[in-house]
Amino acid sequence: MAISHQFKREDAVRLLRDLVRVPTVNPPGADTPGAELLARELERRGFKPELTEIAPGQANVTARLRGTGEAPALLFNGHIDVVPPGELPWKHPPFEAQVEDGRLYGRGAADMKSGLAAMLLAFDVVARGGKLRGDLIFSAVSDEEIGAAGAQRLVSDRLTRGVGAVVIGEPTGFNAYVAQKGLCWLELETVGSTAHGSMPHLGRNAIVDMQALLAEVLAIPLREGPDPVHGRTTLNIGTIRGGVGPNVVPDLCRVSLDFRLPPGIPDEQLMEEVRAAVRKAGAKLPGMRVDIHPTVSRVAVATPVQDRIVQLVLQLCREKLGRRQGPLPTPGFATDASALCSDPPIPFVIIGPGKEELAHKPDEYVEIEDYLNAVDLYAELARRYLGPATPD
């Protein structure tokens, strides 16, 4: 569906290309240059952004468009950091922002520099209109891909105080998500004792112990939460490390686990099931030593589909994009909604340009028209949610 844009197409494409060309890779966490670029873009448009250091090399940038205070604020949120480009070859180099056949390629083009740039442009479009009843806040945060330190800093700095709703511009292909699974990352470690590979009976093989432990972990029921619409718990075994060579009995083995928990299943329930798996494995292989190290935890969050922000998003998807859809409850990926919207609960919607299945892959891209349409969607959403100020 064609949309009459309220901004210059060339400027929008330039902004996104400039942003993708900055390698804000996390790890190691080097996104301050991206935050500084966004701050300059906001200053160029007449705003007074705040740049906040989160850690060396990491920073948030925020800006606020003041309303009259008659209504709660709306928070636009996105993250600056991107995952590493990986070892697989790219046809389009990851930090050159090449444009081909209506697509802009690069690491972060979908996840989520297109959503972030679209929110900045929408912020500017709204500012050029009349005064609104509530504040519009733009927030670009650090460290979403690892630990959510940037979003946590927004909360600790009280930027979410007085916010009535949050819009997170992750790549969803304009599907509207209203819930997010919790995230529980664990590292399991089995500790044995080393020996020469020709005399394995003189040692204890930590990899063999881990094999028995993983069999019990994989038997943990992947449960639904109280509302089946949010799906089941999922488990991914992400990494396994152990041993130094075929002629040495390994004395250490480490495995990383990624559990995603639907709303209503607390971390502690899962942890007890993991501890039970350890006990079962130990009963089969007496003397097994296991250490459990939680590494990352994010709570599950959900917004009622009847909430005003959800209904406005769905209405605008119909009007602007010709998409008739209901809200989708839970994406497969994690976002900063768990940090921003859990305590206290704040309604949120996750919606943005770009396809989620392209995130973290070689030759990631965004359709330029989708990116441009997102600007108009976000701008109109802000105008309708906040509403025009009451005349004096």
Question: Where in this protein do the model-derived segments appear?
Answer:
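Metal-dependent amide/peptide-bond hydrolase catalytic core
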Residues: 1-2, 7, 53, 178, ...
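Acidic/His- and Gly-rich active-site-bordering loop/insert found
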Residues: 2-107, 128-132, 345, 355
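Residue-level signal for inorganic ion chemistry
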Residues: 19, 23, 170, 210, ...
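Short helix-capping segments at alpha-helix termini
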Residues: 45, 128-132, 159-161, 280-287, ...
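Short acidic loop-to-helix transition motifs that present clustered carboxylates
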Residues: 55-60, 172-173, 333-334
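Fold-level recognition of mixed alpha/beta catalytic cores in primary-metabolism enzymes, strongest
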Residues: 101-104, 109-110, 114-219, 360-373
